[in-house]
Amino acid sequence: MPKLNALVVGSTGYIGVQLIKLLVKHKYINIKYLCGNSSVGKKISNYDKYFLNKKLPKIIKFNKNLLKNIDVVFTALPNGEAQDISKHLNKNTTLIDLAADFRLEKSSDYLKWYKQKHRAKNLIKKSLYSLPEINGKDINNYQIISCPGCYPTSILLPLIPLFKNNLIKVKNIVMDSKSGYSGAGRGVHIKFKDKNLYESLSAYGVGYHRHNSEIEQMLKKFTKKNLDFNFTPHLTPMFRGILSTIYVDLEKDVTQSKIIKTLYNFYKKNHFIKILKADSLISTNDVINTNNCFISVCKSKYKNKIIILSAIDNLIKGGAGQAVQNLNIKFNFPIKSGLLWDMF
């Protein structure tokens, strides 16, 4: 099978670097171009010593002419920038976006949550918000693939099967997520320069974090009822990983064992989702440097409630790994291609 030519735009951010680490191990991918802005002319090894002995192109500035011989473009850019690139795609070029440009199905929602007008409205309907385990099977019908955010990934994977089977109530859901500071990007060091980033736990986006929008959009596909949930993210003094704790009310006569069995049956043929035994305690250490999601269902002191724990690596399953997983589905590559763990 010939290799696909890939272009990565936004090569030097935490997600971009992680993506390149995965792609250099992907036997069906040739990294033809790496693009950046302030990093033009530099080597990617300047940003991670892992690349010191890797043969990779120097970072250049993106221009639309680079797309001529490219099969797949990965965009790991600030929100809004992939929209401009999407307008110049060739007929046979796939765009996989790791930001939020094509996550929301309505341009009005994008304006509401991201405070900017969508500059490629006509392409929204040609894009797919692809959470691989849920709707990845539809990916072949789309040229633009939007990867879910890191927090929504950790929340939607345990909740969607339960919504789909009407096992939990759609009201009074509490989603409490804690992430390593890499989730805030390299700029987090500037933002916290006068504070001790490594000794502080802080909530942010309380009540209105942008990821509320895609969580609600996706969950609504699996219920006709009105949703009622609160989602609060936190930055923690660790580099990578997300642990989400989700509190839900059970429907009548639904038990903890029923919840676990449903999740197990839903994901039993999946390579990356692991449903643990009842009341298992999990940590981010269980999943960092992998494309896995660990899910545990725990009892509450109230019989009509359960507590769900969900752990992922925000840079892999919540970012670059999910992009590669979508790539593999789109081009019918073995699902684990580029997602092996001997590289870190």
Which residues fall in each region the model found?
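N-terminal Rossmann-like NAD(P) cofactor-binding subdomain of oxidoreductases
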Residues: M1-E199, Y204-V206, C298-Y302, S337, ...
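Alpha-helical scaffold segments in soluble metabolic enzymes
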Residues: Q18, L22, L157-P161, E214-M218, ...
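Generic secondary-structure signature for well-ordered alpha-helical cores
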Residues: K25-Y28, K164-I168, H209, K220-K224, ...
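Short, glycine- and charge-enriched coil/turn segments that flank and shape catalytic ligand pockets
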Residues: K91, D138, N166, K221-L227, ...
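Short acidic/glycine-rich loop or secondary-structure boundary segments that cap or lie
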Residues: S154-I155, S182-R186, M238-I242, V254-Q256
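Short Gly/Pro-enriched turn/cap motifs at secondary-structure boundaries
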Residues: A203-G207, L235, S283-V287
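Oxyanion-binding "anion nests"
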Residues: Y208-F231, L235, F239, L243-T245
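C-terminal active-site/capping subdomain that shapes the small-molecule cofactor and substrate pocket
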Residues: S244-F344
